[in-house]
Amino acid sequence: MTSMENITEVTEFILLGLTDDPNLQVPLLLIFLFIYLVTLIGNGGMMVIIFSDSHLHTPMYFFLSNLSFVDLGYSSAVAPKMVAALQSGNKVISYNGCAAQFFFFVGFATVECYLLASMAYDRHAAVCRPLHYTTTMTTGVCTILTIGSYTCGFLNASIHAADTFKLSFCGSNKINHFFCDIPPLLALACSSTHISKLVVFFVVGFNVFFTLLVIIISYFFIYIAIQNMKSSEGRKKAFSTCASHLTAVSIFYGTIIFMYLQPSSGQSMDTDKIASVFYTVVIPMLNPLIYSLRNREVKSALWKILNRFYPASFSVSRK
């Protein structure tokens, strides 16, 4: 029997998680369970608010509702398994389960890149061409941008999933991470990963820098338009409509670039884990807060919904 015949392909993986310290398992369980529940309530609530208030049926909120759905999607691809592993101690994930988690996480995360770019284009149209806004951001344009975002996202996920899971995993099946992400999976492969790493660098690089370029160009023209406004009130209003989006963009792209586009020799897996926690579970929780805390229209719509179900309590509390 040859040595090649003795090689056994991996049929399941073990997710090592954030830490193996038993004293930290319960605190981490409570923290991530809380974060995930806030994510579900925040993003689910944002979608309900937008769909239930006709005043929010505008391009900006159409994109925002899709962003909430996407945040739910890629957070749900990771958080439930992580919480279950912390609760039960069972860190095993099947090969197919790992591939599915990988596919949906990469897909939804890439969709978010393109949605953020679409939202920047929408803000550019609103600030730079307000008189033509309704003819620029039509229902058809918004639909095309959204469908294009999902298409690019899951096309990207298909490329990475096919490229990663064609590799041979015949050695250790212990993934030094809390979910099936690209870097730790490539580290486990027993076949050459040179081509796969090039695919990651160039495909992720294209998606990130193309969408980031759209955002930068949009905000360059937005900045010029704001500087040319004579009214300080107009400047303040224009800036406030963009501030939330800029905050979300900065946090999201900062962590994505740190994770996937720096030289592999310049990062440790533990550092990767910390960054991964941020963009897999923290950012989806923060986005609805970022977009709602300074948004009067969302707050007003929320009060209307609460007043509809609890008229006595909330009519008094608003006075």
From Swiss-Prot:
Carbohydrate-modified residues: N6
Keyword NAD: no
Domain of life: Eukaryota
Keyword Hydrolase: no
Keywords, sorted A to Z: Cell membrane, Disulfide bond, G-protein coupled receptor, Glycoprotein, Membrane, Olfaction, Receptor, Sensory transduction, Transducer, Transmembrane, Transmembrane helix
Membrane-spanning segments: 27-47, 56-76, 101-121, 135-155, 198-218, 239-259, 273-293
Subcellular location: Cell membrane
Residue ranges annotated as Cytoplasmic topological domain: 48-55, 122-134, 219-238, 294-319
Biological process according to GO: G protein-coupled receptor signaling pathway; sensory perception of smell
Family: Belongs to the G-protein coupled receptor 1 family.
Name of the protein in question: Olfactory receptor 5B21
UniProt organism field: Mus musculus
Gene giving rise to this polypeptide: Or5b21
